Swiss-Prot record:
Function recorded in the entry: Catalyzes the deamination of 5-methylthioadenosine and S-adenosyl-L-homocysteine into 5-methylthioinosine and S-inosyl-L-homocysteine, respectively. Is also able to deaminate adenosine. Adenosine-5-monophosphate (AMP) and S-adenosyl-L-methionine (SAM) are not enzyme substrates.
Annotated cofactor note: Binds 1 zinc ion per subunit.
Gene from which the chain derives: mtaD
Pfam families reported in the protein's UniProt record: Amidohydro_1
Native organism taxonomy: Bacteria, Thermotogati, Thermotogota, Thermotogae, Thermotogales
UniProtKB keywords: Hydrolase, Metal-binding, Zinc
Binding positions for substrate per the UniProt entry: 84, 136, 148, 173, 203, 279
Annotated protein name in UniProt: 5-methylthioadenosine/S-adenosylhomocysteine deaminase
Top class in the EC scheme: hydrolase
């Protein structure tokens, strides 16, 4: 299949050119320049690499808007956790379908998830067609985790590598909800399987632990995606740049819960690898990485207008996000995954077209025309080809009534 006769943005550092993309067996076979015979004419559009959301809790779409204007502690312990206690497997499945519907509308091809009922989240990813790195959220009390690590291992054995779209890692929630001994068990398990870890680190100013301890029990040796890192001590930046450590910067969620602004520019200047995430819809409340990208840039520019430039922002949401998750995506090049986004250039905010990359970061609403994963459309011109969206809406209506009737 050849798509194009439109502008092509190959990667974060390139400039758009007129051309087309040939796709075969889920990968990019050729990138063509000039006008060619195509199977799908995308005149008036831009094709670019898809985006990757490196931190979310997908079923929390069901909790969107339930807790507003609260501190982090009030939000989590008084509002969110009591509702989560009522979430069933079916709810997790449809909450994840809904999350993918929203993310696909915003050009996202894959996401990192930490939650429970992860087997049903995996089924939702299987059915919808996205990519995902899935982890079971892990906590313990004096070494007893209620069987959570075994659940995570079962998830790994059953789903890791599925269709080349689903990878499974391990999800210790945070150092304040996991004992040091338990964290070591988790990192040792991940290391033995060559699997990644995702964890919340230094999200709030109240977190008091020494990262040196976590480095020594496994963080140095296991690929890790660390969400937030708002209050990560700068003395560790130099160490973290030399290990397989990726920050997932979640600016909207961090601001909304009053947790502050991560020093992203300083991290990048030290050579650290930084990606972007949305967090869950209960704390954002959107799953729009284009919005997140703009917000991230503006927050850093408050100190210096040269901070977090356009190319850096685009790299964070495409190439860096894909690398963190373990996918050969984020560039339109021969042999790379056909994970693509199509954007309508007739939108008012996309004019003048000569400044297109700037618009993607600082003007675009995030409502894309189409999103492709592994050569298949998961969203195209308002439709979701892989699911029955009307059936999903009916199920979500029933779930809302069940979840909030009491």
């Amino acid at each position: 299949m050849i798509i194009g006769n439109c502008l092509i943005l190959k990667d974060f550092s390139s400039e758009p050119f007129w051309g087309a993309v040939e796709i075969e067996n889920g990968t990019i076979k050729r990138v063509l320049q000039g006008e060619v015979k195509v199977d799908l004419d995308l005149s008036g559009k831009l094709v670019m690499p898809a985006l990757f959301n490196t931190h979310t809790h997908a079923p929390m779409t069901l909790l969107r808007g339930v807790a507003e204007d609260l501190s982090f502690e009030e939000w989590l312990f008084s509002k969110v956790l009591p509702i989560e206690d009522r979430l069933t497997e079916k709810m997790a499945y449809y909450g994840t379908i809904l999350a993918q519907m929203e993310m696909a509308r915003h050009g996202i091809a894959g996401f990192v998830d930490m939650y429970f009922h992860e087997e049903w989240i995996a089924k939702a990813v299987r059915d919808f067609g996205m990519r995902a790195l899935l982890t079971r959220g892990l906590v313990d009390s004096n070494g007893d985790d209620g069987g959570r690590l075994e659940e995570n291992l079962k998830l790994y054995n059953e789903w890791n590598g599925f269709e080349g779209r689903i990878f499974v890692g391990f999800g210790p929630h945070s150092p304040y909800l996991c004992s040091e001994e338990y964290l070591k068990r988790v990192f040792d398990t991940a290391k033995s399987l060559n699997a990644p870890v995702t964890i919340h680190l230094y999200e709030t100013s109240k977190e008091e632990y020494d990262l040196e301890d976590i480095l020594n029990i496994g963080l140095k040796e296991v690929k890790t995606i660390a969400a937030h890192c708002v209050h990560l001590p700068e003395r560790y930046f130099g160490v973290l740049k030399d290990i397989p450590f990726f920050v997932s910067h979640n600016p909207a969620s961090n601001l909304k819960l009053g947790n502050g602004i991560a020093p992203v520019q300083r991290m990048i200047e030290h050579g650290m690898k930084v990606t972007l995430g949305t967090d869950g819809a209960a704390s954002n409340n959107s799953l729009n990485l284009f919005f997140e990208m703009r917000l991230a840039s503006l927050l850093q520019k408050a100190q210096n207008p040269r901070n977090l430039d356009v190319n850096t922002c685009l790299k964070m949401v495409t190439y860096d996000g894909a690398q963190a998750m373990g996918f050969k995506s984020g560039k339109i090049e021969e042999g790379w995954n056909a994970d693509l986004v199509v954007i309508d250039l007739d939108l008012p905010e996309m004019f003048p077209v000569q400044n297109i990359k700037n618009h993607l970061v600082h003007a675009f609403s995030g409502e894309v025309f189409a999103t492709m994963v592994a050569g298949k459309w998961i969203y195209f011109d308002g439709e979701y080809p892989t699911i029955d969206s009307e059936e999903v809406k009916r199920e979500l209506a029933r779930i809302e009534k069940e979840l909030y009737s009491s």
